[in-house]
């Protein structure tokens, strides 16, 4: 849950996070205790319907898409703003109901990197940038940029950094403007810094608010916002890089001292945090799913890798199963209709039942550990025969494949994700009615890489792929499928539970 931004309505807190190229995107989470969160809506079903988001012609939005959304309540309406670098646009979405998916969209043909809404003396602005921080005035109704409005550099932050200030979150308190940023000095960990001024003209004062990695060298807790409870207590929600599992939110107490926010225990991470709220019975952000649904609607824990082809998946065509029709792909990262959800620390076990009876020549279906260096376990059809196939992408970009014959129509697949002590290993298994669990291939060394820029997810996939030069087994001849053949894989009883 990276890049958090929060607001409070009465005694309910709402948080937005970044999901980049996963669809639907920009989840809105709800809580009453700041600790237990549940997904209640998504800002958009699709950012755009183009080649990039359909994974066509070698194009994709990996590492791009929706970034660092700012969330605000303004004049009885909710607003969200984020940039898409792949399209060179900034989007402002709005709604009357924050718990309803599919907000109204406004496009701005300009990039405002890591922006934050700012409402200062009756006017709305965007504050944005990396290192050099700019400010641009919006129209009164936030429908676009104000013609001849303020549009200038607001301040320039130190340049002798591994990462200069970015990830802005702006707030106003007692006549002062506060700008929160993440930065990364060359000789330390990522940290949270604050600039303040009582005028847009400055001068701006600066203070480091949090510089603590919690024992994970270099992985300082930073980038996020402050929120005030209904009782007047303050809290900070930042995030931390946790290796292969991705980025997780970090909650801590905050207070105000001499006009500055003080985070945690005087700028250090607290070991414990007592919250003065009744525990909120939230639905988990990861969940098992029987796939027994009366309509073609996903549980909110699920997201597709890029835009799905809605004609190629169904719960209702084979009741009790998730049916995925195979589309052509060169591999996992070009395959459409891969259905994903988050994994969880310190580790989790994911299982699913796969029916292969309607798969066709060249089809490959199963479970995956999805990131740039991915791993797969599933069933491949080759020369009319079935093989249990494990695939792993290596550090140098190659593929390691392990296969063995399969006779049954139904198979159970499993991936264990182990993040304990940053071991970051995924292990792949299968079993049939006649066999016990059997590991296939070596454990995958999971690595958070910047090509996808997200933590590992569990994924359910099915696509049609040519063998190419690396065949599953030497006897495979890459036989062509019959024209018009459409293979289907069916999945049921997906489970996810702690290791």
Spans of features found by a protein language model:
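Carbohydrate-active catalytic/glycan-binding domains of CAZyme proteins
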Residues: 1-499
């Amino acid at each position: 849950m990276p890049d958090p931004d929060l607001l409070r309505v009465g005694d309910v807190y709402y948080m937005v996070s970044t999901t980049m190229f996963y669809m639907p995107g920009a989840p809105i989470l709800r809580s009453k205790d700041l600790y237990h969160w549940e997904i209640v809506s998504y800002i958009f079903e699709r950012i755009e319907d183009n080649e990039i988001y359909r994974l066509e012609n070698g194009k994709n939005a990996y590492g791009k898409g929706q970034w660092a959304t700012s969330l605000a309540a303004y004049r009885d309406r909710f607003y969200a703003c984020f940039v898409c670098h792949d399209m060179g646009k900034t989007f402002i979405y709005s709604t009357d109901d924050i718990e309803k998916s599919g907000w109204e969209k406004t496009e701005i043909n300009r990039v405002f990197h890591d922006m934050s809404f700012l409402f200062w003396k009756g006017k709305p602005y965007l504050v944005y940038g990396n290192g050099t921080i700019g400010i641009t005035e919006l129209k009164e109704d936030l429908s676009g940029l104000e013609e001849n409005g303020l549009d200038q550099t607001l301040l320039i932050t130190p340049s002798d950094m591994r990462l200069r200030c970015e990830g802005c979150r702006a707030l106003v308190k007692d006549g002062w403007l506060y700008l929160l940023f993440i930065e990364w000095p060359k000789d330390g960990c990522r940290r949270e810094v604050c600039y303040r001024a009582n005028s847009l003209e400055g001068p701006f004062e600066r203070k480091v608010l949090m510089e603590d990695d919690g024992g994970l060298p270099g992985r300082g807790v930073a980038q996020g916002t402050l929120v005030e409870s209904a009782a007047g207590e303050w809290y900070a929600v930042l995030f931390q890089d946790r290796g292969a599992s991705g980025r997780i939110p970090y909650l801590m107490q905050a207070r105000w001292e001499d006009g500055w926010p003080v985070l945690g225990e005087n700028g250090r991470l607290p070991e414990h945090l007592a919250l003065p709220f009744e525990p909120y019975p939230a639905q988990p952000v990861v969940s098992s799913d029987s796939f027994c649904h009366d309509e073609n609607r996903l549980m909110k824990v699920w997201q597709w890798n890029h835009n799905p082809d809605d004609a190629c998946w169904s719960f209702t065509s084979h009741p009790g199963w998730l049916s995925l029709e195979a589309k052509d792909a060169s591999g996992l990262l070009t395959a459409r209709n891969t259905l994903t959800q988050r994994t969880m620390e310190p580790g989790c076990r994911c299982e699913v039942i796969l029916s292969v009876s309607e798969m066709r020549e060249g089809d490959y279906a199963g479970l995956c550990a999805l990131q740039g260096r991915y791993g797969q376990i599933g069933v491949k059809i080759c020369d009319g025969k079935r093989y249990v196939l494990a695939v792993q992408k290596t550090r140098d970009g190659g593929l390691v494949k392990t296969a063995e014959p399969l006779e049954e129509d139904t198979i159970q697949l499993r991936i264990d994700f182990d993040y304990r002590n940053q071991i970051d290993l995924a292990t792949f298994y299968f079993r049939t009615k006649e066999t016990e669990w059997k590991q296939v291939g070596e454990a995958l060394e999971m690595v958070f890489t910047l090509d996808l820029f997200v933590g590992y997810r569990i994924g359910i996939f099915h696509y049609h792929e040519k063998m190419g030069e690396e065949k599953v087994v030497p006897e495979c001849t890459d036989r062509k499928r019959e024209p018009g053949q459409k293979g289907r894989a069916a999945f049921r009883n997906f489970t996810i539970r702690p290791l």
